[in-house]
Amino acid sequence: MTQQLKFILTREEAASKGVSRPSDLVKLEEEAMILARAPISGVQDAVLGLASSDRIFLGVNVEFEGLPLHHSISAEQFLVANLALNFEQELHACLIPSRFYLESFEEDVPLLLVPQNNRLAHSDPFSAAEICSNPEHCSHLKCRALTAANKSNAQYSKCPSGVALICEGEVYGGWCIESAAYNLSLGPVQAALVDFMARGEGKGFEMITGAVLVEMNDAKVSQEATARILLKTIAPGCNFSVFRCHKTAEN
């Protein structure tokens, strides 16, 4: 039986593949490329990052069949989301095989990986009353989407948002990761799909059966329309719901 390819490698797993230092990351290039999903362009891309935990994280490009390429996830976006979703705070080195260079990072923690607490709560009192005492690990999409929104990095729009997906009883989450200029932002659905690909053992997007988006009441930038388009196309049987939230006062 072929071993399931992974998006995160421990130090021991990397060593078994002959990777013991940053310059060895190139040895993982072919394995990383296989994980890309590019049904439109056919161009597979990958980046590899060495985190402060000594784990190696993979990022690949993801295209969604039937949707314009601007809905896609770039390999760099995938890598950043993979790091953030796994609570890594430092990226020590990054190999970008398709552009043939190794970048080392010796400066402070990248802003996108700084943990956030947006102090959000559900605006609907019934929804607020249903939030579990341990929303990080419960199976309720409403709880998990709010938890994701609270981690959202929305430094430009000031409109944090989070998404939770469910497939065969397993919940996957993601949040908006904003950037500007030539660095494209990543929406909460795409970030949740990174989590789905990284932990979903190769399942297809069409197997996703439920999704919840949580975003601000008065958001000047809403994720709802984009989320509906994306989910309707890749997971036609998915039940999609939206809940509003507001920012609470600081303690």
UniProtKB/Swiss-Prot annotation:
A single MF term (Gene Ontology): cytidine deaminase activity
Domain CMP/dCMP-type deaminase: 136-251
Record-listed substrate binding positions: N61, V62, E63
Top-level taxonomic group: Eukaryota
GO biological process terms, semicolon-separated: cytidine deamination
Active site: E76 (proton donor)
Subunit structure: Homodimer.
Membership in a protein family: Belongs to the cytidine and deoxycytidylate deaminase family.
UniProt protein name: Probable inactive cytidine deaminase 4
Source organism of this protein record: Arabidopsis thaliana
Gene: CDA4
